[in-house]
Structure formats: C-alpha cells, structure tokens
C-alpha cells in the first residue's frame, strides 16, 4: 500500500499505489475522455448502495453533461478518479461556490466507490489526495454530508479529522423512507 511514484500530469500529479489486494491503483484528475467511464462507474455504484444521492434509477447526466463538467474544473472545483486495470472504480469531487465571495473558501466533498473497491484502501487514498489538492487550491474548509447509518464512511471521515457539525433531517428519500444525513466538516 505504499506510494510507488508520482508522475506530473500538467500541474497535477498522477499517483500510483499498490493496494491490499496487490492491484495497482492510479489516482488522477478526471479528463474529458473519462466522461463515459465515469457515468458507467457512477451508475454501477448507485446500483450497489443506498448511501448515495442517486440509486438504481441512475444518475441524471449524460456524456455531454459530464464532459462540460470536466471542462469546468478549477483548483477549487475538481474530480479525481481512481483507476484499476484501466477501469474507473471510484471518484472523489470537491466543489466550491467560487461565484460567492463569502463562500468561496469552502468546498463540498463527494466520494463514490464501487463495491469491488470497498475495504482495500481506495477511499483513503482518494480522500488524502482530494484534501491535499483542496488546500493547494486555496480552500480552507471542506464539508460533506453522509447518511447517519453509514458507519464505515463516518469512521473514514473521522479518521481524516472531519467532525459532525449538524444533521439534515429527511435528507434522502428512498423507497418511501426518509433518511437523515450528518453534515461533517474540517479545516484544510
């Protein structure tokens, strides 16, 4: 699970790791060419868990929407992809509201990991790199929200210094049931 080496990709670094299962993991900035693979990944993850803001019904974006989003990246708004065997198996985005003077110091983090990549270090490495890039990009605070019964994710976030800052009541509505989410945050 050690960092093998880094390769500069424009101003971003592509990082490579060996995971607990012996596979090589590459983490890098998402590129336009990833649009279709990202949608496949996101829809797969949505079928595997009810902890995301979308589920088996699918993600409501198409390839062109995803390309447009990728083209809009800035140091405060970006998405990292985690790739194993040329397949995107996880993603992590940070988005700041740069158009709002009083909010542009703060980003919102979202992470999506396919089931086959659970428990092997992918989420940890994505979080490390995303928080590093958020700080480099000028953010001073990162927030996220997580379903209150997603204990594994909450544990990961707490390991990274996130603290519970509040609760969003009835945040998710899944199969006729409302679920609350915690708001968690940390300084970077």
Regions found by a protein language model. Name each.
Residues 30, 113, 146:
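Hydrophobic adenine-recognition pocket in adenosine-nucleotide-binding enzymes
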Residues 143-146, 158, 163-179:
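Conserved catalytic-core motifs of GNAT/GCN5-like acyltransferases
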Residues 127, 134-145:
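Conserved GNAT acetyl-CoA-binding A-motif
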Residues 40-57:
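Helix-loop element at the rim of GNAT/NAT acetyltransferase active sites that forms part
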Residues 20, 58-116, 127-128, 187:
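Acetyl-CoA-dependent GNAT
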Residues 2-13:
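Short, Lys/Arg-enriched N-terminal segments with co-localized hydrophobic residues
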Residues 127, 150-153, 170-175:
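Short glycine/proline-centered loop/turn elements that form peptide/ligand docking sites
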């Amino acid at each position: 699970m050690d960092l093998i080496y880094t390769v500069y990709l424009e101003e971003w670094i592509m990082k490579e790791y060996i995971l607990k299962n012996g596979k090589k993991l590459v983490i890098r900035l998402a590129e336009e060419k990833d649009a279709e693979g990202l949608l496949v990944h996101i829809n797969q993850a949505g079928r595997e868990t009810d902890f995301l803001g979308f589920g088996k019904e699918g993600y409501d974006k198409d390839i062109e929407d995803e390309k447009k989003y990728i083209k809009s990246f800035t140091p405060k708004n970006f998405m990292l992809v985690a790739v194993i065997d040329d397949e995107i198996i996880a993603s992590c985005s940070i988005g700041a509201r740069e158009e709002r003077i009083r909010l542009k110091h703060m980003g919102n983090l979202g992470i999506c990991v396919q089931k086959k990549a659970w428990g092997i270090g992918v989420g940890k490495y994505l979080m490390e790199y995303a928080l590093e890039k958020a700080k480099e990009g000028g953010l001073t605070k990162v927030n996220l929200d997580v379903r209150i019964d997603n204990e594994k994710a909450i544990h990961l976030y707490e390991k990274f210094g996130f603290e519970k800052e509040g609760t969003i009541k009835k945040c998710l509505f899944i199969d006729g049931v409302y679920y609350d989410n915690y708001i968690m945050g940390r300084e970077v």
